[in-house]
Amino acid sequence: MKFSESWLREWVNPAVTTDELTHQITMAGLEVDDVLPVAGSFTGVKVGHVVECGQHPDADKLRVTKVDVGEEELLDIVCGAHNCRQGLKVAVATVGAVLPGDFKIKKAKLRGQPSHGMLCSFTELGIDVESDGIMELAEDAVIGTDFREFLGLDDVTVDVDLTANRADCFSIRGLAREVGVLNRADVTEPSVEAVAPSIEDKVSIEVKAPAACPRYLGRVVKNVNVQAETPLWMQEKLRRCGIRSIDPVVDITNYVLLEQGQPMHAFDLAKIEGGIVVRMAEQGEKLTLLDGSEAELNADTLVVADHNKALAIAGIFGGEESGVTTETKDVLLECAFFAPDHIRGRARSYGLHTDSSMRFERGVDYALQVSAMERATQLLVEICGGEVAPVVAVESEADLPKPNKVALRRTKLDNLLGHHIADADVVEILERLGLTVEASEEGWVAVAPTWRFDIAIEQDLIEEVGRIYGYDNIPNQNPAAALKMHNHVEADLPLKRVRDLLVDRGYHEAITYSFVEPEQQKLVVPGVEPLVLPNPISADMSAMRLGLIQGLLNTVVHNQKRQQPRVRLFEYGLRFIPCESAENGMRQEPMLAGVIAGTRGEEHWDIETNTVDFFDLKGDLEAVLELSANEKAYSFAALSPESKKANPALHPGQSAAIIVDGKEVGVIGTVHPELERKFGLNGRTIVFEIEWSAINSKVIPEAVALSKFPSNRRDIAVVVDEAVASGDIVNACLEQGGEFLKDAKLFDVYVGKGVEEGKKSLAIALTLQSLERTLEDADIAGAVDAIVAHVSEKFGAALRD
């Protein structure tokens, strides 16, 4: 929004400099982007009157003039402008004047004729106005007046970058209100009196879309002189706000737009058939706009039409056919309130961006239409003449916005601002902003004015109080946070430690959505009904996840489709389990999951490339488990296809339950081939998922004495049924080993010649040692015999020769 400082000071004139004013505006939240002078730097230019104008005797394109600038003698000036003529009021640079670019005016002769000055154009004075020839001033311009003073050129254009919520400041009226509040200064509005009708002509108005157009005003003005010249003062105000003068009717509607903040439009009355109808467009309806382009309208677009055709896109752009031209004699002035929701986005859909649409999208004061209509009528009659008809108004009270009523708590105000502002000051600030304020038990209740659509919640009021009070006036305070040592529980296993371990083992952490596709989830977690979202982002994100495996598998597919054959991922996140006894009927459980696919290692010329298998992931998971528990605390139990706990998403012969302290807390296994096909996985994929609560604590290590005596190793080979887990045999050895057995390790499994069918041979290394003495053969033999006997009794094992 660009505005002229001098125009603003006509409304409110605080005793501050330009720099102070722009700083105030910026600190109030209306950021000033730029401040530019409205004209170049020049001196010695006066208002003059061309008393005589004749042809130069020796040059066809030059004229010899005598100009009165209020001095005793007329000035002889030679001018080459085609519009120079007798009786014209002009801007005269006298001898000694300095124009922009340090151009000095001196006495001269042009083709033998003396020239003691120069008749100036806008461009020569650094004024950004498109013109052809010298300036033509109003007849009432006082001869001899300093031109800078006459046109008020000691002025600046201020460019303010308004945020989307401050539509009320898209006008001189709104900015004056703001500056008045900041400086406790009175705002002087121009006198606008109702224009008395002199004729009774009316146009019928029908609003078929009252929700989109709650108020529509129309007024006929006949016998308008559209050939009249827009006054220079109005042209200058428009120019300084970045709007080019077009014709007096358009200039007046633009002037009211800038001054009052109310967009208006003028129709050629002769081109309206039957009356005005405000309706939604018909799909595909065509309208030629004022810029000559043709718009194909959508059914959600509000239009102003007559009984046969669309005349304009409401609040956005007028139509060419009904626009005012040089032939227009009678006009219909339109002034309406269009609901922001029915204008927002429509301009962009047609590739348009107008001053009107920008204001209507953000919200126009819905109490402004009557006074804006009278202001436009007043200016139109003053400049173009005409006969005025009564205003025809159609209004839907029920569809007009209602003022927002917002409660403000004293405690909340102090808490957010971090500073106590006196009650009287709070009330004064809000009332100066136009709000109606009443006291309440907890603070106040304020009703927003009609021009403030953005005041809707308590924080909005707090912001208003803070910015008007002045953020600079709120003293700085050091944070009052108390520093204390947090109790570190050594037994807690930090998630970061697990993350670091997995990353060190070649994994990448993934974060997948908690919302999943429900039908796909049934393939991974059958038999459990998830929580279904009532308003999902999309159909494939309509259910809360029951586990992390589904998201990880989809991530593997995503990577494989992008030429990433080797994938190692892990994720920590919540699963959402329906539970009637839980809060909100849902239990949220933190889980840790991982997946591997592709080759075991990166491609290397000296290393054989092998595909990952179950034991690769099992080894990585064991490394995680060893962070939290001793070896006896966890185990893996194979799940047969017949087991009730078998997971149908996993391969029946390559999956296991994860047991911690005797409780099943997770699962590990190869993805079922059928599930691989349905997900679109490329090759073998192994996954695990475990409850984080089961592994987030660890066994605190205890320091033990190291034996100074030698250790002894004895190897045994036992034959057992193939169904017996080797881990169970090792654990049985440790159970029976007594004080001398320090370790038992499986180092070989053999099936084949010399071993009965259905059996397998397990070779186990037993390490024995004493803290007190060197073990004798009898000690070692006794321990080994006890272990063999225990294994034989428990598993039917036989010692292999």
From Swiss-Prot:
Binding positions for Mg(2+) per the UniProt entry: 454, 460, 463-464
Cross-referenced InterPro entries, in alphabetical order? aa-tRNA-synth_II/BPL/LPL, B3/B4_tRNA-bd, DNA-bd_dom_put_sf, Fdx_antiC-bd, Fdx_antiC-bd_sf, NA-bd_OB-fold, Phe-tRNA-ligase_IIc_bsu, Phe-tRNA-ligase_IIc_bsu_bact
> What keyword terms does UniProt attach to this protein?
Aminoacyl-tRNA synthetase, ATP-binding, Cytoplasm, Ligase, Magnesium, Metal-binding, Nucleotide-binding, Protein biosynthesis, RNA-binding, tRNA-binding
One GO CC annotation, please? phenylalanine-tRNA ligase complex
Co-factor binding comment? Binds 2 magnesium ions per tetramer.
- Family according to the record: Belongs to the phenylalanyl-tRNA synthetase beta subunit family. Type 1 subfamily.
Question: What is the protein's name according to its record?
Answer: Phenylalanine--tRNA ligase beta subunit
The gene is pheT
